[in-house]
Swiss-Prot record:
Presence of the UniProt keyword Oxidoreductase in the record: yes
PANTHER family: GERMACRENE-A SYNTHASE, OS04G0344100 PROTEIN-RELATED
Cofactor(s) the record lists: Mg(2+)
Organism in which the protein naturally occurs: Helianthus annuus
Listed name of the protein: Germacrene A synthase 1
InterPro entries named in the record: Isoprenoid_synthase_dom_sf, Terpene_cyclase-like_1_C, Terpene_cyclase_plant_C1, Terpene_synth_N, Terpene_synth_N_sf, Terpene_synthase-like, Terpene_synthase_metal-bd, Terpenoid_cyclase/PrenylTrfase
Cofactor comment text: Binds 3 Mg(2+) ions per subunit.
Sites where the protein binds Mg(2+) 1: 312, 316
Gene3D superfamilies the record matches: Farnesyl Diphosphate Synthase (1.10.600.10), Terpene synthase, N-terminal domain (1.50.10.130)
Keyword entries, A-Z: Lyase, Magnesium, Metal-binding, Oxidoreductase
Similarity-based family: Belongs to the terpene synthase family.
Disulfides per UniProt: none
Highest taxon of the lineage: Eukaryota
Described function: Sesquiterpene synthase involved in germacrene A biosynthesis. Germacrene A is a precursor of several sesquiterpene lactones.
Originating gene: GAS1
Length: 559
């Protein structure tokens, strides 16, 4: 059944005397309660951190620009700065150094280098957008070029670097496909024999490679697990810890603001069936951009994504099919006069939704940037229509073909709403040209969107089956291609792997748009991995997300 289009004619809210049967999900409650509401920001402490950062920041800048530093040490320094989440502070200086070093690259210079050094150099270039050739790893393969040399397995740090490097591979880079499988197998066999910080480094990488992790969490773990690497330059470690504590205060204040807003909106009272996940949603948005200048953007995007949670859970876990049709029509109309046609329990949400968007549009119109709000609103309407289509399929027992499922599933993944809402508060960088580029649906965006859909499906399909929800991508793939459940999951994982390669390609220079605009696209794919790699971390946040929220917002970094 085709998605319902925008309609100017209101549907009728016909009341039934019988109490409707509702697909209530009984989601677990919030594990945080009002913990983050009690935070009180002391701006003087933030100012102290900001002032304390100036000296080590200047010391790190001088190190990056040091003309006497050996090129391999310079690349190691840049890699460490990047892993610690400090790149944005020194972007011009770092790019100037990498431009020069990349032009000077000569494969012969790598012949005598060890695996660890080559891996660090490779990652430093690739993470910052420079396509260093993967041929630098050829020397570690046997003469027949079919397998890697067993001798390198004794260099655990080098193997770890090889594994992390392989996550940056592109399509056609077969040596890195082989490197990923080889290094992962060997590291898994060695991890229980390791001790100290190296054991922690390997465990963390096998759990989730840096490239697929949440930047703020990865930075925090790096200066905890890589003290030796950071200690080469005391100023870097000092800056990283001060930076983390500064950001933590800012972000705890943002979390308090959205938590208070959520409480004031009374969604848990008017729509008590929904998932109460304010810290989790804020964490998700923080994963898109952690830099101080995006504070307003995080608050706006968190609020819009919380609206999305209410909508999703209403469609999935409470509303009847008749109510879903009425609500979809009202969202298509986007007019307060449509409120009378929808059930009373969802009217407060509908009014708040319209009011918040109207206020956003009014604010950004003053700056000439209202189009980003309009794009977010239209994406919200699209997802409502997509949710309706899923509900119609569930209601009729229809299992869509895989291509049909994906066409609608990419919409209902919520990717489009979140990615466009993330742009709303980013400021002048979101120009008309940037919005046109987003609307053109470039390859990197398609790849990130696909990961968002399929990673979710692979992890949640059994839970959705048990709840009697619409078929996921796993079910549709099984039906369409007549394969087993295992084969279907393996094929979807291959699609996810290939999508990561396309994202990696899209982040390399020359880029279609600035990395500031590409970062949320890359980071949305990363956050999907964080939330859904091992379980449905959003519905059941007691594991990974609780760990991450505790790490970032409960307790500062010891100096």
């Amino acid at each position: 059944m085709a998605a319902v289009g925008a309609s100017a004619t209101p549907l009728t809210n016909t009341k039934s005397t019988a109490e409707p049967v509702r697909p209530v999900a009984n989601f677990p409650p919030s594990v945080w309660g009002d913990l983050f509401l009690s935070f009180s920001l002391d701006k003087s402490i933030m100012e102290e951190y900001a002032e304390a950062m100036e000296e080590p920041k200047e010391q790190v800048r001088r190190l990056i620009l040091d003309p006497t530093m050996d090129s391999n040490k310079k690349l190691s320094l840049i890699y460490t700065v990047h892993r610690l989440g400090l790149t944005y502070m020194f972007l011009k200086e770092i790019e100037a150094q990498l431009d020069r070093l990349f032009k000077e690259f000569n494969l012969e210079d790598y012949v005598e280098l060890d695996l660890y050094t080559i891996s660090i150099n490779f990652q430093a270039f690739r993470h910052l957008g420079y396509k260093l050739p993967c041929d630098v790893f050829n020397k570690f393969k046997n003469d027949d070029s079919t397998t890697f040399k067993e001798s390198i397995t004794g260099d655990v740090r080098g193997m770890l670097g090889l594994y992390e490097s392989a996550q940056l591979r592109l399509k056609g880079e077969n040596i890195l496909d082989e490197a990923s499988a080889f290094a992962e197998t060997k590291l898994k066999s060695l991890v229980n024999t390791l001790e100290g910080s190296l054991a922690q480094q390997v465990k963390q990488s096998l759990r989730r490679p840096f490239h697929q992790g949440m930047p703020m969490v990865e930075a925090r773990l790096y200066f905890s697990n890589y003290q030796e690497e950071c200690s080469a330059h005391d100023s870097i470690l000092k800056l990283a810890k001060l930076h983390f504590n500064y950001l933590q205060l800012q972000q705890k204040e943002e979390l308090r603001i959205v938590s208070q807003w959520w409480k004031d909106m009374r969604f848990q009272e008017t729509t008590p069936y929904i998932r109460d996940r304010v810290p989790e949603i804020y964490l998700w948005i923080l994963g898109l951009y952690f830099e101080p200048r995006y504070s307003l953007a995080r608050i706006i995007a968190t609020k819009i994504t919380l609206f999305l949670v209410v909508l999703d859970d209403t469609y999935d876990a409470y509303a009847t099919i008749e109510e879903i049709r009425l609500l979809t029509d009202a969202i298509n109309r986007w007019d307060i006069s449509a409120m009378n046609q929808i059930p009373e329990y969802i009217r407060p949400f509908y009014k708040i939704l319209l009011d918040e968007y109207a206020e956003l549009e009014k604010q950004l119109a003053k700056e000439g940037r209202a189009n980003s709000v309009i794009a977010s609103k239209e994406a919200f309407q699209d997802i409502a229509r997509g949710y309706l289509e899923e509900a119609e399929w569930t209601n009729s027992g229809y299992v869509a073909s895989f291509p049909e499922y994906m066409k609608n599933g990419l919409i209902t993944s919520a990717y489009n709403v979140i990615s466009k809402s993330a742009l709303v508060g980013m400021g002048e960088i979101v120009s008309e040209d940037a919005l046109v580029w987003y609307e053109s649906h470039p390859q990197i965006l398609q790849a990130s969107e696909l990961i968002s859909r399929l990673q979710d499906d692979v992890m949640t399909y059994q839970f959705e089956r048990e709840r009697g929800q619409s078929a996921t991508g796993v079910d549709s793939y099984i039906k369409t291609y007549g394969v087993s459940e295992k084969v279907a999951i393996d094929e979807l994982k291959k699609m996810i792997e290939n999508a990561w390669k396309e994202i990696n390609e899209g982040c390399l220079k020359p880029r279609e748009v600035s990395m500031d605009l590409l970062a949320p696209i890359l980071n949305l794919a990363r956050m999907i991995d964080v939330v859904y790699r091992y379980d449905d971390g959003f519905t059941f946040p007691g594991k990974t997300l609780k760990e991450y929220i505790t790490l970032l917002f409960v307790g500062s970094s010891p100096m």
